[in-house]
Amino acid sequence: MANQTNSGNERVDLAYRRRKNAEEMRHQMIAFVLMILLTLIAFAAVGYEEFSHWFVVPFILLLAAVQVAFQLYYFMHMSHKGHEFPAMFIYGGVAVMLLLVWAFTTVVWW
Protein backbone atom coordinates (compact mmCIF):
# COMPACT_ATOMS: atom_id res chain seq x y z
CA MET A 1 0.00 0.00 0.00
CA ALA A 2 2.96 2.31 0.55
CA ASN A 3 3.83 2.25 -3.16
CA GLN A 4 0.35 3.29 -4.26
CA THR A 5 0.46 6.77 -5.76
CA ASN A 6 -3.28 7.33 -6.26
CA SER A 7 -4.86 7.28 -2.84
CA GLY A 8 -7.73 9.62 -3.63
CA ASN A 9 -6.42 12.22 -1.21
CA GLU A 10 -4.74 15.08 -3.05
CA ARG A 11 -2.59 16.09 -0.07
CA VAL A 12 -1.24 12.57 0.34
CA ASP A 13 -0.56 12.32 -3.39
CA LEU A 14 1.18 15.71 -3.42
CA ALA A 15 3.32 14.81 -0.40
CA TYR A 16 4.25 11.49 -2.01
CA ARG A 17 5.22 13.16 -5.30
CA ARG A 18 7.27 15.81 -3.50
CA ARG A 19 9.10 13.16 -1.49
CA LYS A 20 9.83 11.11 -4.61
CA ASN A 21 10.97 14.22 -6.53
CA ALA A 22 13.25 15.26 -3.67
CA GLU A 23 14.76 11.78 -3.54
CA GLU A 24 15.27 11.75 -7.31
CA MET A 25 16.88 15.20 -7.22
CA ARG A 26 19.24 14.06 -4.46
CA HIS A 27 20.34 11.10 -6.60
CA GLN A 28 20.80 13.38 -9.62
CA MET A 29 22.94 15.84 -7.65
CA ILE A 30 25.11 13.07 -6.18
CA ALA A 31 25.69 11.63 -9.65
CA PHE A 32 26.46 15.09 -11.05
CA VAL A 33 29.00 15.83 -8.32
CA LEU A 34 30.63 12.42 -8.84
CA MET A 35 30.94 13.09 -12.57
CA ILE A 36 32.50 16.49 -11.95
CA LEU A 37 34.92 14.83 -9.53
CA LEU A 38 35.83 12.16 -12.10
CA THR A 39 36.43 14.89 -14.68
CA LEU A 40 38.71 16.77 -12.30
CA ILE A 41 40.62 13.55 -11.58
CA ALA A 42 41.09 13.05 -15.33
CA PHE A 43 42.40 16.60 -15.75
CA ALA A 44 44.74 16.12 -12.79
CA ALA A 45 46.06 12.86 -14.24
CA VAL A 46 46.85 14.56 -17.54
CA GLY A 47 48.39 17.59 -15.87
CA TYR A 48 50.58 15.60 -13.49
CA GLU A 49 53.94 15.22 -15.23
CA GLU A 50 55.05 12.12 -13.30
CA PHE A 51 52.44 9.85 -14.93
CA SER A 52 53.41 8.32 -18.25
CA HIS A 53 50.98 8.27 -21.14
CA TRP A 54 50.84 4.47 -20.80
CA PHE A 55 49.04 5.01 -17.50
CA VAL A 56 47.07 8.15 -18.33
CA VAL A 57 45.30 6.94 -21.48
CA PRO A 58 43.81 3.72 -20.01
CA PHE A 59 43.01 5.58 -16.79
CA ILE A 60 41.05 8.24 -18.67
CA LEU A 61 39.24 5.56 -20.68
CA LEU A 62 38.28 3.85 -17.42
CA LEU A 63 36.99 7.13 -15.99
CA ALA A 64 35.04 7.73 -19.21
CA ALA A 65 33.43 4.29 -18.95
CA VAL A 66 32.41 5.00 -15.36
CA GLN A 67 30.91 8.34 -16.42
CA VAL A 68 28.94 6.70 -19.23
CA ALA A 69 27.57 4.15 -16.76
CA PHE A 70 26.57 6.94 -14.35
CA GLN A 71 24.86 8.89 -17.11
CA LEU A 72 22.95 5.88 -18.36
CA TYR A 73 21.91 4.80 -14.91
CA TYR A 74 20.94 8.14 -13.39
CA PHE A 75 20.41 10.76 -16.09
CA MET A 76 18.77 8.42 -18.60
CA HIS A 77 16.62 7.03 -15.75
CA MET A 78 17.70 3.43 -16.24
CA SER A 79 17.31 2.96 -12.49
CA HIS A 80 13.52 3.39 -12.74
CA LYS A 81 11.01 0.60 -13.09
CA GLY A 82 9.68 0.11 -16.59
CA HIS A 83 13.00 0.88 -18.29
CA GLU A 84 14.22 -2.70 -18.47
CA PHE A 85 13.51 -3.11 -22.19
CA PRO A 86 15.45 -0.01 -23.35
CA ALA A 87 18.23 -0.92 -20.89
CA MET A 88 18.45 -4.38 -22.45
CA PHE A 89 18.97 -2.84 -25.89
CA ILE A 90 21.57 -0.38 -24.62
CA TYR A 91 23.54 -3.05 -22.77
CA GLY A 92 23.19 -5.40 -25.76
CA GLY A 93 24.58 -2.67 -28.02
CA VAL A 94 27.51 -2.16 -25.65
CA ALA A 95 28.19 -5.90 -25.69
CA VAL A 96 28.14 -5.98 -29.51
CA MET A 97 30.43 -2.94 -29.64
CA LEU A 98 32.92 -4.56 -27.25
CA LEU A 99 32.81 -7.77 -29.29
CA LEU A 100 33.47 -5.83 -32.51
CA VAL A 101 36.38 -3.93 -30.98
CA TRP A 102 37.86 -7.18 -29.70
CA ALA A 103 37.37 -8.91 -33.09
CA PHE A 104 38.88 -6.08 -35.15
CA THR A 105 41.77 -5.70 -32.74
CA THR A 106 42.48 -9.42 -33.00
CA VAL A 107 42.28 -9.38 -36.81
CA VAL A 108 44.49 -6.31 -37.19
CA TRP A 109 47.18 -7.34 -34.70
CA TRP A 110 47.47 -10.99 -35.81
UniProtKB/Swiss-Prot annotation:
Protein name: Cytochrome c oxidase subunit 4B
Compartments where located: Cell membrane
GO terms, molecular function: cytochrome-c oxidase activity
Catalytic activity, EC: 7.1.1.9
Family: Belongs to the cytochrome c oxidase bacterial subunit 4 family.
Membrane topology classification: Multi-pass membrane protein
Protein keywords: Cell membrane, Membrane, Translocase, Transmembrane, Transmembrane helix
InterPro entries: Cyt_c_oxidase_su4_bacillaceae, Cyt_c_oxidase_su4_prok
Enzyme class per UniProt: translocase
Domain of life of the organism encoding this protein: Bacteria
CC terms in the record's Gene Ontology section: plasma membrane
Sequence intervals crossing the membrane: 29-49, 55-75, 89-109
